Every structure is written in C-alpha cells, then in structure tokens.
Amino acid sequence: MALPILLDCDPGHDDAIAIVLALASPELDVKAITSSAGNQTPEKTLRNVLRMLTLLNRTDIPVASGAVKPLMRDLIIADNVHGESGLDGPALPEPTFAPQNCTAVELMAKTLRESAEPVTIVSTGPQTNVALLLNSHPELHSKIARIVIMGGAMGLGNWTPAAEFNIYVDPEAAEIVFQSGIPVVMAGLDVTHKAQIHVEDTERFRAIGNPVSTIVAELLDFFLEYHKDEKWGFVGAPLHDPCTIAWLLKPELFTTVERWVGVETQGKYTQGMTVVDYYYLTGNKPNATVMVDVDRQGFVDLLAERLKFYA
C-alpha cells in the first residue's frame, strides 16, 4: 500500500524536482501540496506548485497557500538562487486549475482527519505552516507518522556561517517542529551538499527525452549556474529537497544517526542554527533521525529511473 504524504514546499528548483520525484513514485500517495514562502514570495511559490502540477498532469491534487510570513519575523527570500519567478530556466505551463479556497493549515488538518492511517509530512521549505498546524491542532498529532524536513546542518550554514536557509527564515517554527514529540527526519546540508548533480547527470536526464525530464534538465541548467561560484567548492549543484523523497523511497541510500536537535532562535552569530547533540552532551533524548551521508550515484540513478515514468 502506498505511503500517504503531505508535501509542504516553496518551489524553488529543488522543490520542483522533489514534486517530480514524488509523483513518479507509486510507493507514495501525495494527498495534498501546500506552499510556503521562502525561495520566493508566497504568491510565486503557490503559482509554481500549480505550474508543476499542470506540467505533470496532476491537477487532481488539492493545493493550498500557506502563511505569508514567518511566525515572528519578516520574510527573507532566496531570489538570488532561484530567479525572479522562483523557477527560472525552463518554459513552464501556466496553471490550468486553482488552489483550494482554504489555508494550508486547513488543508493539512482536513487531510490528516480524513486519512485512515497516519500521514508523513514532507516539508522542504521553512517550517512555518507545519508549526502552525502543530500549534493549532494538537488533537491531530497522532495522525502524523513523521515529519521529514530539508533543513539545518550539523556544522555549517549556507545563508549565514551557522544557519541553513530554511531554518534561518523561521527558526521559531523549526524549534516547534523539533520539540513536538513527533518523529523528525532531518535532511540537512551535511547530506544534501553531497547529493550533487553534475553536468553529465543533467545530460543523462535530458537524454531520457520526455517533456518532464527535459524540464528537469533545464531547471538544473539554471541551478548549476548559481552553484558555479568558487566559494562553494562544488563540482555540481546540491539537490537539497529531493533527498527527503529519496529517503522515503530508498532509505538504504542514506546514512543516518539518532540525535537530539534544537534550534537557536536568539544567537548574535548563530540565529537559525540547528544544534545537533552529536556526542550526547546534553543528556536529552534523541528527537530526530539526522542524515549524514548519501550514496550520490544511487541518488542520481533513482532520479533517472523515476524520470522515465513520464514517457
């Protein structure tokens, strides 16, 4: 039986590819998709979800727009990474359907209520919508199997020296998620920076030759340009968000550790840092499964195999 999932995302090139991977995988049943502000403004990330589902001919999936800003802060966006539209590069179709007439939290709550079994929430943007759901619907916590997030890192940041972008945008929301008591799986920069797509991988995807694999290759063409900056020291582009979906499909591709994680909300230099208690120094019980390594070739092979679904 397919695993029911709720996808909360802020497309964003890597979010878009996570959607492609999830919907090409019969092991997963995507019940709904909600948009969060992050990689671009809330209007643009919502539009990008609708554009991707139009491209994939999955306009049957309910979509709702989430919070327009973080819980306690002004919104920061990553338009320098993802371009003016949030999905610059390919010519994507205009949406052919409308979002639900409700908020992301309302759609999430409805989906959880109606599901016969606990649902896995996959969150690849800031954690604002998920935190609002947890705070407003404590009665539904038991309907959440786990929360798989792309965010954080054990020792480095990509937005500040200490903080990864998704957590930095809304650290208070991320702290609510980590301390919720619900199992959390964290795909942080420690693993996503190893999940790099090289130029030859992009050409492999392009050669698959269907409309979706072509769009994915064009998304990666744009994404690779940003990551050519020498400061990163990358060979290719790190495909952050699809690591969450890949872990659900093939956990054996990833090395993980069970650790306690907290989020710094106050620090002068460390605001938004995920503090991972690697050596069990706090005495706190582990609250997260933290990804630390990935079989890069296996990850690329999984993407290539699933892109053939769209032939």
Curated annotation (Swiss-Prot):
One of its GO terms (molecular function) is uridine nucleosidase activity. SUPFAM superfamilies: Nucleoside hydrolase. Keywords: Glycosidase, Hydrolase. Pfam families: IU_nuc_hydro. The active site is at 240. One of its GO terms (biological process) is nucleobase-containing small molecule interconversion. One of its GO terms (cellular component) is cytosol. Its EC number is 3.2.-.-. It comes from the Bacteria. PANTHER family: INOSINE-URIDINE PREFERRING NUCLEOSIDE HYDROLASE, URIDINE NUCLEOSIDASE. Hydrolyzes with equal efficiency cytidine or uridine to ribose and cytosine or uracil, respectively. Belongs to the IUNH family. RihA subfamily. This is Pyrimidine-specific ribonucleoside hydrolase RihA. It comes from Escherichia coli O7:K1 (strain IAI39 / ExPEC). The gene is rihA.
